[in-house]
Amino acid sequence: MDEILEEELEKKESEEFEERIVEIRRTAKVTKGGKTLSFRVLAVVGNRKGKVGVGVGKAREVPEAIRKAIAAARASVVEIPLYKTTIPHEVFGRQDASKVLLRPAAPGTGIIAGSTVRAVVELAGVQNVLTKCLGSTASVNLALATLNGLKDLVSPEKAAKLRDITPAQVLYGARKEA
């Protein structure tokens, strides 16, 4: 049993993930003796093939905070369905007061997004997407809202079955008959 768990862990670690630090923020705790400084780091990891994770690390030293953030991001990796170079359908992600709208885009559009949302969708492997951030623009909440939206994605076949339409109608919209 332990051998299987070790093999699974090695397999997960050996999988090549690209890492990106989105934000490094210095925080101060004011005490009677003065200010205690620490750092908070937001990191995103992904393999550009449909797997992405977001993590936050806090420590008194920047390198330690970065290490913790990357470890947290690797632990939170989720798999998302991609359709060619975009997402299969429109989706809305929420985290606290932050909201992110993600819409599929035609090839050649690129990633139309702010820096935090861009980091998450780029490392997920999406190449063409339109996004809009609504509400709070706090980096951590935006990254988590984007991840929540990506988690809500379903494959075109599954979406079509749920809505009782064809997969083509999910991807290209329902055609009106004259």
UniProtKB/Swiss-Prot annotation:
Provide the GO MF annotations for this entry. Answer: rRNA binding; structural constituent of ribosome
Please give a single GO biological process term from the UniProt record.
translation
> Can you give the residue ranges of the S5 DRBM domain?
17-80
**Keywords of this protein's UniProt record, alphabetized?**
Ribonucleoprotein, Ribosomal protein, RNA-binding, rRNA-binding
Q: Does the keyword Ribosomal protein apply?
A: yes
List GO terms (cellular component aspect): small ribosomal subunit
Residues that span the membrane, as ranges: none
Q: Which Gene3D superfamilies did the record assign?
A: 3.30.160.20, 3.30.230.10
Does this UniProt record's set of keywords contain tRNA-binding?
no
Q: One matching Pfam family, short form?
A: Ribosomal_S5
Fetch the SUPFAM superfamilies from UniProt.
Answer: dsRNA-binding domain-like, Ribosomal protein S5 domain 2-like
Where are the disulfide bridges?
Answer: none
Say which family it is in.
Belongs to the universal ribosomal protein uS5 family.
Relate the assembly described in the record: Part of the 30S ribosomal subunit. Contacts proteins S4 and S8.
Q: Which NCBIfam families match?
A: rpsE_bact (TIGR01021)
- Domain free text: The N-terminal domain interacts with the head of the 30S subunit; the C-terminal domain interacts with the body and contacts protein S4. The interaction surface between S4 and S5 is involved in control of translational fidelity.
Tell me the function of this protein: With S4 and S12 plays an important role in translational accuracy.
The protein's name: Small ribosomal subunit protein uS5
Annotated source species: Pseudothermotoga lettingae (strain ATCC BAA-301 / DSM 14385 / NBRC 107922 / TMO)
Lineage here is: Bacteria, Thermotogati, Thermotogota, Thermotogae, Thermotogales
Gene symbol here is rpsE
